[in-house]
From Swiss-Prot:
<dbReference type="GO" id="GO:0007306">
    <property type="term" value="P:egg chorion assembly"/>
</dbReference>
<dbReference type="Pfam" id="PF04625">
    <property type="entry name" value="DEC-1_N"/>
</dbReference>
<feature type="repeat" description="2">
    <location>
        <begin position="484"/>
        <end position="509"/>
    </location>
</feature>
<feature type="region of interest" description="Disordered">
    <location>
        <begin position="186"/>
        <end position="210"/>
    </location>
</feature>
<dbReference type="GO" id="GO:0005213">
    <property type="term" value="F:structural constituent of egg chorion"/>
</dbReference>
<comment type="function">
    <text>Required for proper assembly of the eggshell.</text>
</comment>
<feature type="repeat" description="1">
    <location>
        <begin position="458"/>
        <end position="483"/>
    </location>
</feature>
<keyword id="KW-0964">Secreted</keyword>
<feature type="region of interest" description="Disordered">
    <location>
        <begin position="23"/>
        <end position="60"/>
    </location>
</feature>
<feature type="repeat" description="3">
    <location>
        <begin position="510"/>
        <end position="535"/>
    </location>
</feature>
<dbReference type="Pfam" id="PF04624">
    <property type="entry name" value="Dec-1"/>
</dbReference>
<dbReference type="GO" id="GO:0007304">
    <property type="term" value="P:chorion-containing eggshell formation"/>
</dbReference>
<feature type="signal peptide">
    <location>
        <begin position="1"/>
        <end position="21"/>
    </location>
</feature>
<dbReference type="GO" id="GO:0042600">
    <property type="term" value="C:egg chorion"/>
</dbReference>
<protein>
    <recommendedName>
        <fullName>Defective chorion protein</fullName>
    </recommendedName>
</protein>
<dbReference type="GO" id="GO:0005576">
    <property type="term" value="C:extracellular region"/>
</dbReference>
<dbReference type="InterPro" id="IPR006719">
    <property type="entry name" value="DEC-1_N"/>
</dbReference>
């Protein structure tokens, strides 16, 4: 438990001790004699909240090693103090340890055993234990310290007892001392005269003990190579014999020696009993789960289960609402109860009260100080929680907007990734060229119309003057035609009349009066027009030079 976490509590205790000493420093006799707190000398003054907060010791900066946690504790001191007090609470010793089924580490195991699909169908293969390594057993002695010294002791009895406790070594068939094979009988030599029997030898003297080992060694050497003769090395006999079978070596005496001399040492690897050789296991493979604690499939299952539970609750609520009777009796509630329920804050600190305590009793200075500090702490915690709630809502809104933007960008990128064929490209280019040409033509027509409207609005009189000047130029160029005009018109009219008369003699006979009247009317109209033209011609001739100059001036830019 860290010491700096107790500093705020120690400072609070010091402040309370100082306040108690100030209150108890008054005259005890005066306090005992007075029955009420109405006098100004005995009744202490209730300090304000600012004074109480000013008397609190400064909060030392918390250095947990994590910059994020340090910044959080500095920005939210009330919540930081709650977290520190919660960490100091001995929850495991009072409430007990958390069970394994509730711990996420135990639930998210990384090793998964995959069993075989059909264990009986697979071939049963006997598991072979690896052979023991005697060299490893011999080298498995503990390392001796550098200053290790053996005590001086008499090892005679111990060695004798050890040799007596040793297990018997495996018996190896010895070839030493074997009886020599009987050689083939040699041919009998010639008969010789029998020698007289020798006299009985005197009893041999006892051989001293020192000469017995030499005699035994000589006998062993004499009997060692007696079997090395040609008769024993018969090829046909050796091939017909079976190879000698030796008992397997027993390495257990090494472990026995190790247990005898070093009782506290871990014994070497012991060979498994014959009955423990089991068959092959049904586990086909062992897989390792990835580092992700919860996969997407598990999250989807959890989400679907939660949604189903919510739907079930909603259906139950709707069913309960439908079963509400027509007549519902409400218990009468007072306005005070409703007001108290509405004014309950987010965090409510209930002070321990007793039934016999009088509500009108005067509170001591320490109680008032504690209540004021608790109220200030409550307001601070509520304000910090509201700030955190607003920040969480703002971040949730920003994340939603960012996800919408990301989805929009993804949709745009997906539409742009579609490949276009050559025909699509040609159609798009043709459409672009056609639209460009139509746009140019429409703009050109608009410009012409605008220019024509501008010209007509700007100079309507100049257009009339231009038309009149053109007419005057034509009249000036052909004055003789104007003079000869009436005669030529009469001749032309007479020629046309004659042609018509020739084409329609019947019409001439039927309506001679109509033809004469028509001819007389036309002649009179022509005679009336000709004097007016002749009178206007001199005036036109005089005005023509002025009109030509005006036309030239208007046409020049």
């Amino acid at each position: 438990m860290r010491l700096y976490s107790h500093l705020p509590l120690l400072a609070l205790l010091v402040v309370q001790a100082v306040g108690q000493s100030q209150v108890t420093s008054e005259d005890p006799a005066r306090d005992a004699g007075s029955t009420s707190n109405s006098t100004a000398a005995t009744r202490p003054r209730i300090p304000s909240q600012e004074e109480i907060l000013g008397q609190m010791p400064p909060i030392p900066p918390i250095r947990t090693g994590s910059p994020q946690m340090d910044v959080f504790y500095m920005m939210f001191p009330a919540l930081g103090s709650l977290l520190r007090w919660g960490s100091l609470f001995p929850a495991q010793s009072i409430l007990g340890a958390m069970p394994d089924n509730l711990q996420p580490e135990a639930a998210a195991s990384r090793v998964v055993l995959v069993l075989a699909d059909d264990a009986t169908a697979k071939a049963r293969v006997v598991r072979q234990n690896p052979p023991l390594n005697p060299l490893g057993q011999l080298m498995n002695w503990p390392a001796l310290p550098q200053d290790f010294q053996l005590p001086s002791m008499d090892l005679g009895p111990q060695v004798g007892s050890f040799l007596a406790q040793l297990p018997p070594m495996p018996a190896i068939p010895s070839i030493l001392g074997a009886a020599a094979p009987v050689p083939a009988p040699a041919p009998a030599p010639a008969a010789t005269p029998l020698a007289p029997a020798p006299a009985a030898d005197p009893p041999a003297a006892p051989v001293p003990d020192a000469a017995q080992p030499a005699i035994l060694g000589q006998a062993a050497l004499q009997n060692a190579f007696t079997f090395l003769n040609p008769s024993n090395f018969d090829a046909s006999g050796l091939l017909g014999q079976s190879a000698p079978t030796f008992a397997p070596p027993n390495f257990d005496f090494v472990a026995q020696m190790q247990r005898q001399f070093f009782p506290g040492m871990t014994p070497a690897q012991q060979p498994a009993p014959a009955g423990t050789d089991a068959l092959a296991s049904d586990i086909s493979e062992v897989r390792v789960r990835p580092e992700a604690p919860y996969s997407q499939e598990a999250q989807m299952k959890i989400k679907s289960a939660l949604e189903m539970e919510q739907e079930r609750q909603q259906q139950a609520q709707v069913k309960d609402q439908e079963q509400v009777p027509l007549l519902w009796f409400h218990m009468p509630t007072t306005q005070a109860q409703v007001k108290d329920q509405e004014q309950v804050p987010l965090l409510w600190f209930h002070m321990p009260t007793t039934q016999n305590q009088d509500a009108t009793a005067e509170k001591t200075l320490e109680d008032l100080r504690v209540e004021a500090k608790l109220r200030a702490f409550e307001r601070q915690v509520i304000s910090e929680l509201r700030m955190l709630q607003k920040e969480a809502q703002r971040r949730a809104g920003n994340s939603g907007m960012n996800s919408q933007k990301a989805n929009a960008l993804k949709r745009q990128a997906k539409s742009q990734e579609q490949a276009l064929s050559k025909e699509d490209i040609v159609q798009i280019m043709a459409y672009a060229y056609r639209m460009a040409n139509e746009q140019m033509e429409s703009e050109k027509g608009k410009q012409d119309k605008v220019y024509a409207a501008y010209r007509t609005e700007q100079s309507p009189m100049t257009m009339e003057q231009r038309q009149w000047s053109e007419d005057q130029a034509k009249i000036q160029q052909n004055p003789q035609q104007i003079q000869q005009g009436p005669m030529m018109m009469q001749q032309r009219q007479s020629a046309e009349d004659q042609a018509k008369m020739q084409q329609s003699p019947m019409m001439m006979q039927q309506s001679p009066m109509m033809m004469q009247q028509r001819q007389s009317a036309e002649d009179q109209a022509k005679m009336q027009q000709s004097p007016m033209v002749m009178q206007q011609s001199p005036m036109m001739m005089q005005q023509s030079p002025m009109m030509m100059q005006q036309r030239q001036w208007t046409e020049d830019p």
